[in-house]
Amino acid sequence: MKASELRGKDAAGLNQELSELLKAQFSLRMQKATQQLQNTSQLKKVRKDIARVQTVLTQKANAK
């Protein structure tokens, strides 16, 4: 997901996206802890996506 795509969403949509990403991150962490996760690079991708969403939310909040 690109930051330009995120900038087109409103704050409610971004908060929902953030919530889904945090749930996905938790699930991936549990899979990693129980050694069920095959593709560990997914953790990095989700972490970066969370950072992107939080950055766009902060930018929108500071713009007001």
UniProtKB/Swiss-Prot annotation:
Q: Does the keyword Ribosomal protein apply?
A: yes
Alphabetized, the UniProt keywords read: Ribonucleoprotein, Ribosomal protein
Q: Which GO terms describe its molecular function?
A: structural constituent of ribosome
Q: Please indicate if the UniProt record lists Cytoplasm as a keyword.
A: no
Pfam families associated with the record:
Ribosomal_L29
One Gene Ontology BP term is: translation
Per the record, its GO cellular-component terms are: cytosolic large ribosomal subunit
Similarity comment:
Belongs to the universal ribosomal protein uL29 family.
* Cited NCBIfam families: L29 (TIGR00012)
Name the chain's protein: Large ribosomal subunit protein uL29
